Protein backbone atom coordinates (compact mmCIF):
# COMPACT_ATOMS: atom_id res chain seq x y z
CA UNK A 1 0.00 0.00 0.00
CA UNK A 2 2.81 2.39 0.88
CA UNK A 3 4.51 1.58 -2.43
CA UNK A 4 1.28 2.30 -4.35
CA UNK A 5 0.85 5.61 -2.51
CA UNK A 6 4.43 6.59 -3.30
CA UNK A 7 4.00 5.79 -7.00
CA UNK A 8 0.79 7.86 -7.12
CA UNK A 9 2.53 10.79 -5.42
CA UNK A 10 5.41 10.68 -7.90
CA UNK A 11 2.97 10.53 -10.81
CA UNK A 12 1.11 13.58 -9.53
CA UNK A 13 4.24 15.59 -8.77
CA UNK A 14 6.15 14.88 -11.96
CA UNK A 15 4.15 17.19 -14.30
CA UNK A 16 4.55 20.07 -11.88
CA UNK A 17 8.23 20.34 -12.79
CA UNK A 18 8.85 21.20 -16.42
CA UNK A 19 12.22 19.65 -17.35
CA UNK A 20 12.06 17.98 -13.94
CA UNK A 21 15.66 17.06 -13.11
CA UNK A 22 17.02 20.46 -14.12
CA UNK A 23 14.37 22.51 -12.31
CA UNK A 24 14.37 20.35 -9.19
CA UNK A 25 18.17 20.57 -8.99
CA UNK A 26 18.08 24.37 -9.29
CA UNK A 27 15.42 24.61 -6.58
CA UNK A 28 17.30 22.21 -4.32
CA UNK A 29 20.52 24.22 -4.61
CA UNK A 30 18.68 27.50 -4.07
CA UNK A 31 17.01 26.17 -0.93
CA UNK A 32 20.41 25.12 0.38
CA UNK A 33 21.53 28.76 0.25
CA UNK A 34 18.68 29.66 2.63
CA UNK A 35 19.30 26.92 5.19
CA UNK A 36 19.30 23.18 5.79
CA UNK A 37 16.17 21.24 4.88
CA UNK A 38 15.59 20.61 8.58
CA UNK A 39 15.74 24.33 9.43
CA UNK A 40 13.46 25.32 6.54
CA UNK A 41 10.91 22.57 7.12
CA UNK A 42 10.77 23.18 10.88
CA UNK A 43 9.81 26.85 10.46
CA UNK A 44 6.29 27.17 11.89
CA UNK A 45 5.95 30.76 13.12
CA UNK A 46 7.68 33.87 11.86
CA UNK A 47 7.67 37.44 13.18
CA UNK A 48 9.28 40.24 11.16
CA UNK A 49 9.39 43.88 12.20
CA UNK A 50 10.90 46.86 10.45
CA UNK A 51 9.98 49.90 8.43
CA UNK A 52 9.26 50.94 4.87
CA UNK A 53 11.24 53.75 3.27
CA UNK A 54 9.51 55.19 0.16
CA UNK A 55 11.72 56.08 -2.79
CA UNK A 56 10.18 59.55 -2.96
CA UNK A 57 11.15 61.73 0.02
CA UNK A 58 7.77 63.48 0.02
CA UNK A 59 6.05 60.20 0.88
CA UNK A 60 5.84 59.25 4.59
CA UNK A 61 7.68 56.23 5.94
CA UNK A 62 5.82 53.43 7.70
CA UNK A 63 6.51 50.81 10.34
CA UNK A 64 5.59 47.23 9.56
CA UNK A 65 4.98 44.09 11.61
CA UNK A 66 4.36 40.71 10.02
CA UNK A 67 3.32 37.70 12.08
CA UNK A 68 2.81 34.44 10.20
CA UNK A 69 2.04 30.86 11.14
CA UNK A 70 2.17 27.80 8.92
CA UNK A 71 0.22 26.85 6.93
CA UNK A 72 -1.89 29.94 6.24
CA UNK A 73 -2.31 32.51 9.02
CA UNK A 74 -0.97 36.06 8.95
CA UNK A 75 -1.32 39.35 10.77
CA UNK A 76 0.15 42.37 8.98
CA UNK A 77 0.23 45.75 10.72
CA UNK A 78 1.32 48.86 8.81
CA UNK A 79 1.48 52.19 10.67
CA UNK A 80 1.84 55.57 8.96
CA UNK A 81 1.81 58.45 11.46
CA UNK A 82 -1.46 57.92 13.40
CA UNK A 83 -3.07 55.64 10.83
CA UNK A 84 -2.92 51.88 11.33
CA UNK A 85 -4.00 49.22 8.86
CA UNK A 86 -4.20 45.66 10.14
CA UNK A 87 -4.71 42.72 7.79
CA UNK A 88 -5.69 39.42 9.38
CA UNK A 89 -5.78 36.09 7.58
CA UNK A 90 -6.92 32.87 9.20
CA UNK A 91 -7.17 30.03 6.72
CA UNK A 92 -9.97 30.85 4.28
CA UNK A 93 -11.16 33.98 6.12
CA UNK A 94 -9.68 37.45 6.37
CA UNK A 95 -10.39 41.07 7.18
CA UNK A 96 -8.81 44.51 7.00
CA UNK A 97 -9.04 46.94 9.94
CA UNK A 98 -8.27 50.65 9.65
CA UNK A 99 -7.76 52.70 12.82
CA UNK A 100 -6.78 56.28 13.70
CA UNK A 101 -4.66 56.48 16.85
CA UNK A 102 -5.27 60.23 17.21
CA UNK A 103 -9.04 59.79 17.41
CA UNK A 104 -9.81 57.31 20.19
CA UNK A 105 -13.55 57.99 20.00
CA UNK A 106 -13.77 57.04 16.35
CA UNK A 107 -14.50 53.38 15.77
CA UNK A 108 -12.16 51.32 13.66
CA UNK A 109 -13.37 50.51 10.17
CA UNK A 110 -13.48 46.78 9.55
CA UNK A 111 -14.31 44.99 6.34
CA UNK A 112 -14.06 41.48 4.98
CA UNK A 113 -11.38 40.88 2.37
CA UNK A 114 -12.47 40.52 -1.23
CA UNK A 115 -11.82 37.15 -2.86
CA UNK A 116 -8.89 38.64 -4.77
CA UNK A 117 -7.37 40.14 -1.59
CA UNK A 118 -7.83 36.85 0.23
CA UNK A 119 -6.13 34.96 -2.58
CA UNK A 120 -3.17 37.36 -2.65
CA UNK A 121 -2.64 37.48 1.12
CA UNK A 122 -2.87 33.69 1.37
CA UNK A 123 -0.28 33.43 -1.40
CA UNK A 124 2.10 35.86 0.34
CA UNK A 125 1.69 33.93 3.59
CA UNK A 126 2.61 30.63 1.99
CA UNK A 127 5.67 32.26 0.42
CA UNK A 128 7.15 32.91 3.86
CA UNK A 129 7.46 29.16 4.37
CA UNK A 130 8.07 27.78 0.86
CA UNK A 131 11.71 28.87 0.32
CA UNK A 132 11.46 28.42 -3.46
CA UNK A 133 9.78 25.02 -3.25
CA UNK A 134 6.63 24.28 -5.26
CA UNK A 135 3.24 24.27 -3.52
CA UNK A 136 2.19 20.88 -4.90
CA UNK A 137 -0.97 20.64 -2.79
CA UNK A 138 -2.45 23.66 -4.56
CA UNK A 139 -1.23 22.69 -8.00
CA UNK A 140 1.70 25.09 -8.34
CA UNK A 141 3.96 24.39 -11.32
CA UNK A 142 7.57 25.40 -11.89
CA UNK A 143 8.74 25.88 -15.47
CA UNK A 144 12.28 26.48 -16.66
CA UNK A 145 12.45 29.50 -18.96
CA UNK A 146 16.13 29.48 -19.81
CA UNK A 147 19.12 31.64 -18.92
CA UNK A 148 18.84 35.41 -18.71
CA UNK A 149 20.93 38.32 -17.54
CA UNK A 150 19.27 39.94 -14.54
CA UNK A 151 20.81 42.85 -12.65
CA UNK A 152 24.18 42.08 -14.19
CA UNK A 153 24.09 38.40 -13.23
CA UNK A 154 23.57 35.36 -15.47
CA UNK A 155 20.58 33.56 -14.02
CA UNK A 156 18.32 30.56 -14.36
CA UNK A 157 14.80 31.89 -14.92
CA UNK A 158 12.00 29.90 -13.25
CA UNK A 159 8.28 30.60 -13.59
CA UNK A 160 6.11 29.54 -10.65
CA UNK A 161 2.39 29.46 -11.48
CA UNK A 162 -0.87 28.43 -9.81
CA UNK A 163 -4.07 27.27 -11.54
CA UNK A 164 -5.84 30.41 -10.24
CA UNK A 165 -3.54 32.66 -12.26
CA UNK A 166 -1.08 33.85 -9.61
CA UNK A 167 2.48 33.55 -10.84
CA UNK A 168 5.99 34.55 -9.80
CA UNK A 169 9.21 34.64 -11.78
CA UNK A 170 12.44 34.01 -9.90
CA UNK A 171 16.00 34.47 -11.10
CA UNK A 172 18.72 32.35 -9.49
CA UNK A 173 22.41 33.08 -10.11
CA UNK A 174 24.15 30.39 -12.12
CA UNK A 175 27.45 30.80 -10.28
CA UNK A 176 26.26 30.53 -6.67
CA UNK A 177 22.52 29.61 -6.78
CA UNK A 178 21.50 32.74 -4.85
CA UNK A 179 18.17 34.44 -5.52
CA UNK A 180 18.84 37.57 -7.58
CA UNK A 181 15.33 38.83 -8.23
CA UNK A 182 11.64 37.99 -7.87
CA UNK A 183 8.93 39.47 -10.10
CA UNK A 184 5.20 39.08 -9.42
CA UNK A 185 2.48 38.75 -12.05
CA UNK A 186 1.69 42.41 -11.30
CA UNK A 187 5.15 43.42 -12.49
CA UNK A 188 6.55 44.31 -9.05
CA UNK A 189 10.16 43.22 -8.60
CA UNK A 190 11.74 42.54 -5.21
CA UNK A 191 15.49 42.34 -4.64
CA UNK A 192 16.88 41.06 -1.35
CA UNK A 193 19.95 42.87 -0.01
CA UNK A 194 22.31 41.75 2.76
CA UNK A 195 21.77 38.77 5.02
CA UNK A 196 21.14 37.83 8.63
CA UNK A 197 20.95 34.31 10.01
CA UNK A 198 18.19 33.47 12.49
CA UNK A 199 17.69 29.90 13.75
CA UNK A 200 19.84 28.62 10.89
CA UNK A 201 17.79 30.37 8.20
CA UNK A 202 19.05 33.20 6.01
CA UNK A 203 16.90 36.33 5.80
CA UNK A 204 17.63 39.64 4.04
CA UNK A 205 18.53 42.84 5.86
CA UNK A 206 16.34 44.77 3.48
CA UNK A 207 14.18 44.24 0.40
CA UNK A 208 14.02 46.74 -2.46
CA UNK A 209 10.88 46.95 -4.60
CA UNK A 210 10.74 48.16 -8.20
CA UNK A 211 8.16 48.64 -10.95
CA UNK A 212 10.15 48.38 -14.15
CA UNK A 213 13.17 50.65 -13.70
CA UNK A 214 11.50 52.76 -11.01
CA UNK A 215 12.19 52.07 -7.34
CA UNK A 216 9.01 52.08 -5.25
CA UNK A 217 10.25 51.61 -1.70
CA UNK A 218 12.57 49.63 0.54
CA UNK A 219 11.58 47.43 3.45
CA UNK A 220 14.25 47.48 6.16
CA UNK A 221 14.17 44.40 8.38
CA UNK A 222 14.92 45.31 11.98
CA UNK A 223 14.08 42.13 13.88
CA UNK A 224 13.17 38.52 13.08
CA UNK A 225 11.83 35.89 15.45
CA UNK A 226 11.57 32.25 14.45
CA UNK A 227 9.27 29.72 16.13
CA UNK A 228 8.59 31.94 19.14
CA UNK A 229 5.26 31.65 21.02
CA UNK A 230 2.50 33.86 19.65
CA UNK A 231 -0.17 35.74 21.56
CA UNK A 232 -3.41 33.80 21.86
CA UNK A 233 -6.01 35.02 19.39
CA UNK A 234 -3.49 36.93 17.26
CA UNK A 235 -5.18 35.64 14.08
CA UNK A 236 -8.77 35.79 15.33
CA UNK A 237 -11.17 37.50 12.93
CA UNK A 238 -13.15 40.15 14.92
CA UNK A 239 -16.73 39.27 15.80
CA UNK A 240 -19.20 40.09 13.10
CA UNK A 241 -16.88 39.39 10.18
CA UNK A 242 -18.14 37.09 7.48
CA UNK A 243 -16.37 33.79 7.11
CA UNK A 244 -16.09 31.64 4.04
Task: Give the role of each language-model region.
Residues 1-9:
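Sec-dependent signal peptide recognition
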Residues 62-65, 86-91, 105-116, 171-172, ...:
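Short amphipathic beta-strand/extended segments with alternating polar/hydrophobic composition
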Residues 19-28, 32, 93-166, 230, ...:
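Flexible, processing/modification-adjacent segments and terminal tails
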Residues 19, 25-103, 143-144, 162:
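N-terminal mature ectodomain segment of secretory-pathway/periplasmic proteins
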Residues 83, 147-238:
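Gly/Pro-enriched, hydrophobic low-complexity segments
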Residues 52-59, 75-80, 125-140, 159-163, ...:
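Short, solvent-exposed secondary-structure boundary motifs
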Amino acid sequence: MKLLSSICLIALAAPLFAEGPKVSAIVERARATAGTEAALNNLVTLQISGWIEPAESKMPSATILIISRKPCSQRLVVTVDDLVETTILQGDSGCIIRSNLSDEEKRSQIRTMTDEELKRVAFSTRQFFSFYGADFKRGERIEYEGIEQRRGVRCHKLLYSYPDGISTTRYFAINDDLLVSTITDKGVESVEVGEQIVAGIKFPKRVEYYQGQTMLHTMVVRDIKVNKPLKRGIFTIPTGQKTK
